[in-house]
From Swiss-Prot:
Its cofactor is a divalent metal cation. This is Long-chain acyl-[acyl-carrier-protein] reductase. The keyword NAD applies. It catalyses: a long-chain fatty aldehyde + holo-[ACP] + NADP(+) = a long-chain fatty acyl-[ACP] + NADPH + H(+); a long-chain fatty aldehyde + holo-[ACP] + NAD(+) = a long-chain fatty acyl-[ACP] + NADH + H(+). It is an enzyme of class 1 (oxidoreductase). GO terms for molecular function: oxidoreductase activity. The keyword Nucleus does not apply. Gene3D superfamilies: NAD(P)-binding Rossmann-like Domain. InterPro entries: AAR (IPR016836), NAD(P)-bd_dom_sf (IPR036291). Its EC number is 1.2.1.80. Catalyzes the NADP-dependent reduction of long-chain acyl-ACP to the corresponding fatty aldehyde. Involved in the biosynthesis of alkanes, mainly heptadecane and pentadecane, by producing the fatty aldehydes used by aldehyde decarbonylase.
Length: 341
């Protein structure tokens, strides 16, 4: 059995979704209530592969909200993630994906050192961040968008915002070794990590955000949007493709203009409908088929019987792992969300 551990994007959305899903006792509550609310299994899921194989899973709502980080309730945030993981393990779930901010919290707050959750010793091989599949899907989206717009990827400039992160660094490796992009621009906050990534790749131009964006034919955004940052569409190339790989996805509402294309990055579409409620809450265009690639990774690991923490740690994603999960993705009927023009 697979599990999907996730959360909603805001207190306002949490109230709305609770009301729609019949959790009336949650619908009118504030942050204090959500801070103490335990994890809940709120969806039972059945997925059929293109091969005909059928698997079953559960969606675990962690009851974490981003406002907890904004209010500097870091202990609350870490407790939410650990409790959700413990809940999944107690229910016998073999492999669970840490979706949204849950994997970021796990890494940034070093939760690997907090293996004991009350009477449960977490078995980390039961969990995956899903970042390998996410990185693979984003790279395929860049490749497909280039073909759609008639852009020669080997002559194109790709800027990766958040290049030193787990997903960002994997994307950079694939763009360099598999796609052979013309120019690669690396943008991130940590200069030392940028220097190390540039040395590893043997290429890549390090630029601040405001200098990087106007040079790029493709912008892969896999970082949180800094407060106060405004992207002027007039400064971007035409055409310019922005792959929004963050969560929540909001570049589409912030960057609009002639010749500017925004694509939800790290989203896949399955070949068959899935009877579930949670992707409607994620505001997918086709919630019965579309999902985050990190969630799909847990399904793929279940389909393949790979019950292991396939994506784990920071900057451990290899080209070989991306190829392996990519082959499984195709085999079981997933395809990257395509650019609509």
């Amino acid at each position: 059995m697979f599990g999907l551990i996730g959360h909603l994007t805001s207190l306002e959305q949490a109230r709305d979704v609770s009301r729609r899903m019949g959790y009336d006792e949650y619908a009118d509550q504030g942050l204090e209530f959500w801070s103490s609310a335990p994890p809940q299994i709120v969806d039972e899921i059945t997925v059929t592969s293109a091969t005909g194989k059928v698997i079953h899973g559960r969606y675990i709502e962690s009851c974490f909200l981003p406002e907890m980080l904004a209010a500097r309730r870091f202990k609350t945030a870490t407790r939410k993630v650990l409790n959700a993981m413990s809940h999944a393990q107690k229910h016998g779930i073999d492999i669970s994906a840490l979706g949204g901010f849950t994997s970021i919290i796990f890494e940034n707050f070093d939760l690997a050192s907090l293996r004991q959750v009350r009477d449960t010793t977490l078995e980390f091989e039961r969990f995956t961040t899903g970042n390998t599949h996410t990185a693979y899907v984003i790279c395929r989206q860049v490749e497909a968008a280039a073909k759609t717009l008639g852009i020669d990827i080997t002559q194109a400039t790709v800027a990766v915002v958040g290049a030193t992160g787990d997903i960002g660094s994997a994307v950079c490796r694939w763009l360099d070794l598999k796609l052979g992009v013309g120019d690669l621009i690396l943008t991130a906050r940590n200069q030392e990590r940028l220097d190390n990534l540039q040395a590893e790749l043997g290429r890549g131009k390090i630029l601040p955000l405001e200098a990087a964006l106007p040079e790029a034919d493709f912008i892969v955004w896999v970082a949180s949007m800094p407060q106060g940052v405004v992207i002027d569409p007039a400064t971007l190339k035409q055409p310019c493709v922005l792959i929004d790989g963050g969560y929540p996805k909001n570049l589409g509402s912030k960057v609009q203009g002639e010749g500017i294309y925004v694509l939800n990055g790290g989203v896949v579409e399955h070949c068959f409908d899935i009877d579930w409620q949670i992707m409607s809450a994620a505001e997918m265009a086709r919630p019965e088929r579309q999902m985050f690639a990190c969630f799909a990774e847990a399904m793929l690991l279940e389909f393949e019987g790979w019950h292991t923490n396939f994506s784990w740690g920071r900057n451990q994603i290899t080209i070989e792992k991306m190829e392996a999960i990519g082959e499984a993705s195709v085999r079981h009927g997933f395809q990257p969300l395509a650019l609509a023009i």
